[in-house]
Amino acid sequence: MQPRVLLAVTLLALLVSARAEEIQESSLLGVMKDYMQQASKTANEMLTKVQESQVAENAREWMTESLDSMKGYWTSLIGRLSGFLDSTPSS
């Protein structure tokens, strides 16, 4: 084989090998990019669920406090009305 042909074949083999490594690196980079996007999406979804859960918990607490307050007001009103009705003279 002539040295020029041997040199050309060697350079061609190196070029093909370098291109194959570049494709593998870009493929690996794509996989990592997809993984990071999926992880970010999952983290955002979980954060949203936690925030919604906290809002729901706050709403339940507010409703419980409001109902307890209304119950206390109603009990107080009934007590005053029954005291007022008991003290009124009957005819």
Curated annotation (Swiss-Prot):
Belongs to the apolipoprotein C3 family. Pfam families: Apo-CIII. The keyword Signal applies. Keywords: Chylomicron, Lipid degradation, Lipid metabolism, Lipid transport, Oxidation, Secreted, Signal, Transport, VLDL. The keyword Transport applies. It is found in: Secreted. Component of triglyceride-rich very low density lipoproteins (VLDL) and high density lipoproteins (HDL) in plasma. Plays a multifaceted role in triglyceride homeostasis. Intracellularly, promotes hepatic very low density lipoprotein 1 (VLDL1) assembly and secretion; extracellularly, attenuates hydrolysis and clearance of triglyceride-rich lipoproteins (TRLs). Impairs the lipolysis of TRLs by inhibiting lipoprotein lipase and the hepatic uptake of TRLs by remnant receptors. One of its GO terms (molecular function) is high-density lipoprotein particle receptor binding. Its main location: secreted. GO terms for cellular component: chylomicron; intermediate-density lipoprotein particle; spherical high-density lipoprotein particle; very-low-density lipoprotein particle. PANTHER family: APOLIPOPROTEIN C-III. The gene is APOC3. GO terms for biological process: cholesterol homeostasis; lipid catabolic process; lipid transport; lipoprotein metabolic process; negative regulation of high-density lipoprotein particle clearance; negative regulation of low-density lipoprotein particle clearance; negative regulation of triglyceride catabolic process; negative regulation of very-low-density lipoprotein particle clearance. The modification Methionine sulfoxide is found at residue 63. Residues 1-20 form the signal peptide. This is Apolipoprotein C-III. Residues 68-91 are annotated as: Lipid-binding. InterPro entries: Apo-CIII (IPR008403), Apo_CIII_sf (IPR038195). The record marks 41 as: May interact with the LDL receptor. It comes from Cavia porcellus.
